[in-house]
Amino acid sequence: MEQVLKKMVKELEKHPKDFNIGHVILAMFYAEGGLSRARLQELLGLGEGSVKSMIKYMKKHRLISTSRAGSKLTEKGVSMLSKIRVFVPKICRISLEYLSVGKINYAAVLRGIKISEILRIRDMVVRFGGTGAVLLFYKDGSVEVPYVTNDLKSISDRDHIKICEIGPKEGDSIIIVGGEDKASTLKALGSVLLELLAHQA
């Protein structure tokens, strides 16, 4: 998986597009069961031309197939997504209060990924167009906010419930990424996920 992702990144760096590899990863999550191009635009917050270009790019790499019904992951795409899901089982939009880091917030559950440089992750999110990021740890049924509290529930019961609703398991990390709009938030989230996944087997 690492080699495939690096190859795709190099290609996009050589020939820049209106989308990045992060959008491709997120599109794979959304296109698993098949969906229309218009729906993909809505989900990713990208324009028609950008989505059209991204679909063409994904077809070139045999990740999706298209028909009148829309786009759907190929066998290769499903295989790659299953490998990604080992490390990132869930991505979703989330409504938060205390933990909010932007007008739009998205959460990703990270499993088996060791993260030691929290500030570096936050800086990376801002560099890729996001407004901020928070990294959480799920331990013994509690949500830890590093350097703040060992139990989110003691600060915001509502946010604790929202985080638990996305289904983290013991030892998981959860990254919250915020942005001004859907497109910039997902671009930042996808870029960070790519950075983390590129170092996994």
PLM region spans:
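Short alpha-helical segments that sit at the start of domains
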Residues: 1-25
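Short capping segments at the starts of secondary-structure elements
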Residues: 30-36
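A short acidic, leucine-rich amphipathic alpha-helix
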Residues: 39-44
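Short amphipathic alpha-helical interaction segments
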Residues: 45-60
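A short, conserved structural fragment
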Residues: 59-69
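Basic, amphipathic "hinge/linker" alpha-helix immediately C-terminal to the N-terminal HTH DNA-binding motif
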Residues: 69-84
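Long, charged amphipathic helices and adjacent flexible linkers at domain junctions
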Residues: 88-101
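Mid-protein regulatory/catalytic core that forms ligand/cofactor-binding pockets
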Residues: 99-199
